[in-house]
Amino acid sequence: MEHPRVVDPRHPLVERVRAVCLALPEAVEVEAWGRPTFRAAKPIFVHVSASMDRPLSIVLKTDPDEHQALTQDGRFFGPPYYDRDRWVGVDLDQPDTDWQLLAELIETSYRQVANRRQRTALDVLRPEHADG
């Protein structure tokens, strides 16, 4: 069954997320459930519009050590249908959207699901953030 599109995949905010995601090694975009998803090969690291109520939002996987702080920040929400102990959602269309923070969180999410080869390739691009 084909799902209806929830958000215009060419919306400028989605394009901004796309640019960050596709700059990561071997990242691909796959439309699933009528929404753009970004994957490190197969595992999803960013899901656009995971909630029907929030079409201009993304859901991403967090670092376990940072998760609690993010959930206490009013800009983030616990997304439905996701493990709320590891995933958070954030609205993209808010005036206080911090795009630098989102880029860092997207990279963290990618690192959570990427395989060793992909993480090594990212470490070459960003040695200051290497997993040491």
Locations of regions flagged by a protein language model:
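Charge-dense, helix-prone N-terminal extensions
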Residues: M1-G132
